[in-house]
């Protein structure tokens, strides 16, 4: 009876213990990341051939305390390596772990290698060669703090490499993990197992091998024990022959019977796998509905890293298991679908042939779906009359659904507002997922054209922080102007929809005037002014990215560039240096900014009078300043304006379009002129 250690993914130790016991292992004890057990030669080979869960089977040959690299070397060089393999054998060292002295696993592996080759030289043998790609023998060294365990790896290649597939696909599921998922799913041999998202079929292949009693390593041609002197070829041939005979006997059986209820087991896409979030929300929602419609009386087991996506199934699990899929923390949830689920669905379909799984989308977030449908009916007709294809459909109308829904052509953007800290995070997440599901159903938009964003309170220029790098631009129309938008790369899209009427007004005011657009963003107001017949335009922003965007907006509208200047600068500093006069000035500064690129911090409430003073200096006698900002509760300093000789007329209500009429504080807007 020799001591062995079977490694496995964390969380599968109990399953592995049961499996090894069934294979005849003795003195089976769980450890972190594996299982200790004792075995004779026959059981040793059985565990190698038959274990579906073990990653490797190791034969420990030495244990020692390691306080320095010399201790490590001395331990290795003192082992009787010639009892295990000869000098013609190519070997490789796997070293895992560190301590205070052995700080890098690569250094540890090098010292183990040095000890082995020096041992052979001391015994008058040639130095064995190291082969990283195809070694004959693998040495496994594990260092935990100061405790070293040296082992021979009897497996060779890791045991998850079954050899039945060459292409792992886009989102591979390791075979040992797949086997564990099958065992934990509740599936019973002899009953159907369905994987509706099978990918390369790993789950089904592992289950089929269990059903047919095919040893998972039956087709492996190279083992870690092939060149090991302790290898018992006769016993190995016996164990392998028994496995072949069992598999052949099972091939003649057909244990599955039509009409039986069984188990649905799948590993659907999730965030780090394939697809985008809205598509996944739709997938899980429809999947849950289909399961309840078509699989009454079945068991269901779903493996995912996203709890929120599992919630979209809208089913209550009776058991769950945690597991790792590579670096991802995942969970496997088991469900039972009652027979009445499919019966009730069939009855609904009989009463109303129009009932389908797609209509079930609106069974979630019904209040939200009804409000969105009502808004669409009202707003889309108006938008068509106005010549708009970018507008807001929903803006936190209902307190339980704190989000905005915007249409940009044939795309939909769902923006979640940050919830108050006292609201349960899980509840907020579920409401968002339900709202996305309902939005897909109500709007009919393709899942690939629904973009989901999470908004947080922005400080300074953080609202311009890049989120992605897809570079996907398309244009929308607004009162005859064409404007580029990007729905994915930034938190904002390049177009503030609430300022639509302000831009239209600027276009109507700009004819034959010199126009200044300060804090210009992507220059959409400049486009309207240019199309409105402005004599010249000057567009100033601190961001080169947005100035380039503004330039592309002008080009898109065939605006002659000679009379239209684009200037990259700190707007406040540029304003102090500017000596040109303007007839019409549009200024829409941030509420607050402390950008490192600005010389001073900015607060619109604190600093707006100073801004007006500098603007008045470059404003022609009959000129107009259009001043806007987004600070809720902003109070104009009329006394300060009076001292500057300026009049202010608030026009906020006139600049609020129909699709923003419920949010009267989204911006405030003012006309400022010189006092006569």
Curated annotation (Swiss-Prot):
Keyword Methyltransferase: yes
Annotated localization: Cytoplasm
Keyword Methyltransferase on entry: yes
GO CC annotation, single: cytoplasm
Gene Ontology molecular-function annotations: 23S rRNA (guanine(2445)-N(2))-methyltransferase activity; RNA binding; rRNA (guanine-N7-)-methyltransferase activity
Enzyme Commission numbers on file: 2.1.1.173, 2.1.1.264
Catalytic activity as recorded in UniProt: guanosine(2445) in 23S rRNA + S-adenosyl-L-methionine = N(2)-methylguanosine(2445) in 23S rRNA + S-adenosyl-L-homocysteine + H(+); guanosine(2069) in 23S rRNA + S-adenosyl-L-methionine = N(2)-methylguanosine(2069) in 23S rRNA + S-adenosyl-L-homocysteine + H(+)
InterPro entries xref list: 23SrRNA_methyltr_KL, DNA_methylase_N6_adenine_CS, RlmKL-like_Mtase, RlmKL-like_Mtase_CS, RlmL_1st, SAM-dep_methyl-trfase, SAM-dependent_MTases_sf, THUMP_dom
Record keywords: Cytoplasm, Methyltransferase, RNA-binding, rRNA processing, S-adenosyl-L-methionine, Transferase
Main location: cytoplasm
Domain THUMP, residue spans: 43-154
Function: Specifically methylates the guanine in position 2445 (m2G2445) and the guanine in position 2069 (m7G2069) of 23S rRNA.
Family indicated by similarity: Belongs to the methyltransferase superfamily. RlmKL family.
Protein name (Swiss-Prot/TrEMBL): Ribosomal RNA large subunit methyltransferase K/L
Organism: Actinobacillus succinogenes (strain ATCC 55618 / DSM 22257 / CCUG 43843 / 130Z)
Lineage: Bacteria, Pseudomonadati, Pseudomonadota, Gammaproteobacteria, Pasteurellales
Annotated gene: rlmL
């Amino acid at each position: 009876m020799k001591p062995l250690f079977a490694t496995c993914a964390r969380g599968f130790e109990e399953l592995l213990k049961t499996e090894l016991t069934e294979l005849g292992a003795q003195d089976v004890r769980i450890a972190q990341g594996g299982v200790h057990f004792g075995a004779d030669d026959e059981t040793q080979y059985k565990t190698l051939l038959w274990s579906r869960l073990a990653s490797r089977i190791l034969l420990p040959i030495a244990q020692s305390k390691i306080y320095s690299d010399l201790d490590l070397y001395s331990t290795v060089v003192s082992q009787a390596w010639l009892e295990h393999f000869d000098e013609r054998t190519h070997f490789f060292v796997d070293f895992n772990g560190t301590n205070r002295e052995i700080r890098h696993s690569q250094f540890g592996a090098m010292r183990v290698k040095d000890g082995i080759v020096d041992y052979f030289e001391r015994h008058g043998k040639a130095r064995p060669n190291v082969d990283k790609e195809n070694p004959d023998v693998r040495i496994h060294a594990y260092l935990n703090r100061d405790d070293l365990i040296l082992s021979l790896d009897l497996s060779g290649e890791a045991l998850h490499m079954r050899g039945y597939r060459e292409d792992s696909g886009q989102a591979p599921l390791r075979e040992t993990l797949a086997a564990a998922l099958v065992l934990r799913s509740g599936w019973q041999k002899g009953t159907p197992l369905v994987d509706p998202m099978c990918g390369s079929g790993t789950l089904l292949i592992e289950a089929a091998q269990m059903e047919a009693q095919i040893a998972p390593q039956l087709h492996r041609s190279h083992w870690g024990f092939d060149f090991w002197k302790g290898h018992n070829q006769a016993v190995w041939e016996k164990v392998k022959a028994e496995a072949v005979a069992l598999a052949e006997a099972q091939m003649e059986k057909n244990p599955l019977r039509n009409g039986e209820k069984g188990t649905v087991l799948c590993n659907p896409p999730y965030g780090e796998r394939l697809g985008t979030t809205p598509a996944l929300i739709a997938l899980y929602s429809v999947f849950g509905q289909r399961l309840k419609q078509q699989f009454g009386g079945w068991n269901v087991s779903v493996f995912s890293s996203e709890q929120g996506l599992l919630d979209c199934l809208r089913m209550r699990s009776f058991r769950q298991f945690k597991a790792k899929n590579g670096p991802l923390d995942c969970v496997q949830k088991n469900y039972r679908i009652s027979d009445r689920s499919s019966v009730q669905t069939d009855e609904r379909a009989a009463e109303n042939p129009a009932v389908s799984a797609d209509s079930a989308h609106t069974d979630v977030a019904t209040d939200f779906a009804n409000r969105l449908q009502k808004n669409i009916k009202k707003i889309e007709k108006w938008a068509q009359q106005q010549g708009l294809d970018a507008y807001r459909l929903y803006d936190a109308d209902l307190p339980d659904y704190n989000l905005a829904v915007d249409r940009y052509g044939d795309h939909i953007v769902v923006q979640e507002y940050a919830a108050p800290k006292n609201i349960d995070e899980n509840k907020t997440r579920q409401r968002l997922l339900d709202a996305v599901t309902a939005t897909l159903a109500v709007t009919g938009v393709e899942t690939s054209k629904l973009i989901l964003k999470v908004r947080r309170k922005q400080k300074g220029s953080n609202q311009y922080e890049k989120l992605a790098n897809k570079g996907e631009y398309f244009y929308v129309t607004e009162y005859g102007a064409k404007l580029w938008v990007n729905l994915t790369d930034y938190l904002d899209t390049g177009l503030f929809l609430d300022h639509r009427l302000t831009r239209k007004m600027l276009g109507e005011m700009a004819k034959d005037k010199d126009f200044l657009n300060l804090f210009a963003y992507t220059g959409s107001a400049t486009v309207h002014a240019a199309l409105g017949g402005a004599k010249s335009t000057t567009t100033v922003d601190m961001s080169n990215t947005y100035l380039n965007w503004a330039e592309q907006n002008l080009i898109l509208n065939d605006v002659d560039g000679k009379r239209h200047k684009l200037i990259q600068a700190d707007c406040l500093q540029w304003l102090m240096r500017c000596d040109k006069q303007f007839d019409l000035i549009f200024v829409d500064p941030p509420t607050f900014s402390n950008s490192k690129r600005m010389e001073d911090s900015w607060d619109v409430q604190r600093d707006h009078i100073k801004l007006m003073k500098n603007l008045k200096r470059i404003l022609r006698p009959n000129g107009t300043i259009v001043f806007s900002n987004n600070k809720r509760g902003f109070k104009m300093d009329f006394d300060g304006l009076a001292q500057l000789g300026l009049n202010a007329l608030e026009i906020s209500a006139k600049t609020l379009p129909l699709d923003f009429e419920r949010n009267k504080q989204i911006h405030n807007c003012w006309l400022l002129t010189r006092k006569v």
